[in-house]
């Protein structure tokens, strides 16, 4: 009702001004028969009230809809007036255009992800051949080639998951997963990486904790944290701990290294996209996308991730999982 009155405020104001004009006209014209004046003003007031009541009856659906603050795209019946009908048709046309643009955007996104997947797999094939050719070679030049190939493989994996993230809802499956088995799979996948940097993981798992997650996406997220821990520990420490423990109703995975640590001014921004910080400038191996993807993935999986660090002493990244659905 307030919105209706505000929308007709000008009309009501004009009626008041008209009443004042009639009153002063009667007064200055020497017509002091107030009974006639009040009769005229009463008729005008009755006409105005009737008009407003009619407009309210016809357009009340519009004002209820505008005042309700309802979310969603469903447009209710707005009323039978010409204004309501035209507004309803316009809204429906806008919704149809939005749906059309949404479908077009989804189609383009699907095409981009499909192209990216095909491109990554095409690049992986010659990399696999290179690995087969040089896997038995121990000369320094071949060791350097192996290192660079692994860097390309990690970059391709990051690119692949980054492109799939926009279609995450189509590409995940929540199920009970053994956290210890998942960690063993991560260690197996990165064993050459550990050897290359001479940093060796140690699992501290008391029981076989079952968590509800998507194994593929979580494995990638843990892998991103592990690779960071290894790269920033190399040459300073050969220790990397994967600790699993319970904290009330949650299971916690802690990836703890004893490397260079993260400066205090960078710790609040490590999950920002493309933020490399001081360590990224020092080591020149950071893209600033890995931890951002970790944060995005854990949020979508309804997990939490936090990070703490002491410069020169190491970094601890904790994943927290609900133990029950």
Swiss-Prot record:
Q: Which residues lie on this side of the membrane: Cytoplasmic?
A: 1-8, 55-325
Primary location: membrane
PROSITE patterns reported in the protein's UniProt record: HIS_KIN (PS50109)
* Primary enzyme class: transferase
Source organism superkingdom: Bacteria
Query: What is the annotated localization of this protein?
Result: Cell membrane
GO MF, one example: protein histidine kinase activity
Q: Name one GO cellular component term.
A: plasma membrane
The membrane-topology field of this record reads: Multi-pass membrane protein
Q: Where are the bilayer-spanning segments?
A: 9-29, 34-54
Q: Name one GO biological process term.
A: phosphorelay signal transduction system
Question: What InterPro entries does the entry give?
Answer: 2-comp_sensor_kinase, HATPase_C_sf, His_kinase_dom, Sig_transdc_His_kin-like_C
Q: Which Pfam families does the entry mention?
A: HATPase_c
SMART domains per UniProt: HATPase_c
Q: Which residues form the Histidine kinase domain?
A: 118-325
Look up the EC number in the record and give it: 2.7.13.3
Q: Which residues lie on this side of the membrane: Extracellular?
A: 30-33
Which residues are recorded with the post-translational modification Phosphohistidine?
121
**Keyword terms:** ATP-binding, Cell membrane, Kinase, Membrane, Nucleotide-binding, Phosphoprotein, Transferase, Transmembrane, Transmembrane helix, Two-component regulatory system
Q: Which reaction does it catalyse?
A: ATP + protein L-histidine = ADP + protein N-phospho-L-histidine
Biological role stated in the UniProt entry: Probable member of the two-component regulatory system YxdK/YxdJ. May activate YxdJ in response to the antibacterial protein LL-37.
The name this protein carries in UniProt is: Sensor histidine kinase YxdK
Q: Which organism is it from?
A: Bacillus subtilis (strain 168)
Please spell out the taxonomic lineage of the organism that makes this protein: Bacteria, Bacillati, Bacillota, Bacilli, Bacillales
């Amino acid at each position: 009702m307030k919105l209706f009155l505000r929308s007709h405020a000008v009309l009501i104001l004009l009626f008041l001004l008209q009443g004042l004009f009639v009153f002063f006209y009667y007064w200055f014209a020497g017509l002091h028969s107030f009974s006639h004046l009040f009769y005229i003003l009463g008729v005008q007031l009755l006409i105005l009230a009737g008009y407003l009541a009619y407009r309210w009856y016809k357009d009340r659906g519009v004002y209820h809809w505008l005042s309700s603050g309802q979310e969603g795209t469903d447009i209710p019946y707005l009323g039978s007036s010409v204004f309501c009908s035209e507004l309803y048709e316009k809204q429906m046309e806008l919704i149809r255009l939005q749906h059309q643009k949404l479908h077009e955007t989804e189609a383009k996104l699907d095409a981009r992800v499909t192209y990216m997947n095909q491109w990554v797999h095409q690049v992986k094939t010659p990399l696999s051949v290179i690995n087969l050719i040089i896997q038995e070679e121990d000369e320094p030049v071949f060791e350097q080639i192996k290192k660079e190939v692994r860097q390309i493989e990690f970059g391709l994996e990051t690119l692949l998951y980054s492109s799939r993230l926009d279609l995450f809802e189509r590409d995940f499956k929540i199920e009970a997963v053994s956290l210890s088995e998942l960690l063993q799979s991560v260690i197996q996948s990165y064993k050459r990486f550990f050897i290359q940097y001479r940093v060796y993981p140690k699992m501290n798992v008391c029981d076989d904790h079952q968590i509800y997650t998507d194994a593929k996406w979580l494995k990638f997220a843990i892998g991103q944290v592990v690779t960071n821990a290894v790269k920033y520990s190399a040459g300073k420490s050969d220790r990397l701990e994967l600790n699993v423990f319970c904290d009330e109703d949650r299971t916690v995975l802690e990836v703890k290294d004893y490397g260079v640590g993260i400066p205090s001014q960078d710790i609040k921004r490590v999950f920002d996209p493309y933020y490399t910080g001081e360590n990224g400038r020092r080591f020149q191996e950071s893209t600033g996308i890995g931890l951002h993807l970790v944060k995005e993935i854990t949020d979508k999986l309804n997990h939490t991730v936090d990070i703490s660090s002491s410069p020169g002493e190491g970094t601890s990244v904790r994943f927290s999982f609900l133990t029950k659905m």
